Amino acid sequence: MNGNWIDIKTSDDTKFQGYLSVPDCGTGPGLIIGQEIFGVNKTMRQIADYFAEEGYVVLVPDMFWRLKERVELAYNEVDFKTAFGYFGKFNLDLAVEDISLSMDKLKTLDECTGGVGYMGFCLGGKLAYLTASKLEPEVAISFYGVGIPEML
């Protein structure tokens, strides 16, 4: 399974990117995957590729693009500090807009033949809660979403 990066256009014609992975059969329902605070790193891309192998058209948008494009951090002490630095500057409202744009982008792709769901990890898990409450995904799943109780 080989994914590639695609452009996602914003309302002001700015672009950000997301990692797209398509099943071998070429089509399937859509799935947005929300990244951890470590960016669209190897782990997030492997998860996308796994779900593509299961038949989904998967898009992992770069949620840190306004701070730095294509952040890719490892799970070590130095990168943890860097990740929390990005997290501290992160704008949740703009992120939900980016998820909406990502969902719209996925729906326009010929490969996406069904509805679009959202699944997020860590920061992406928090965004799953916001996506479910503000957008209309077919399903929203949060894995170890941070800070959700404080938003209730």
Regions found by a protein language model. Give the residues of each.
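N-terminal cap/leader regions of alpha/beta-hydrolase-fold enzymes
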Residues: 1-152
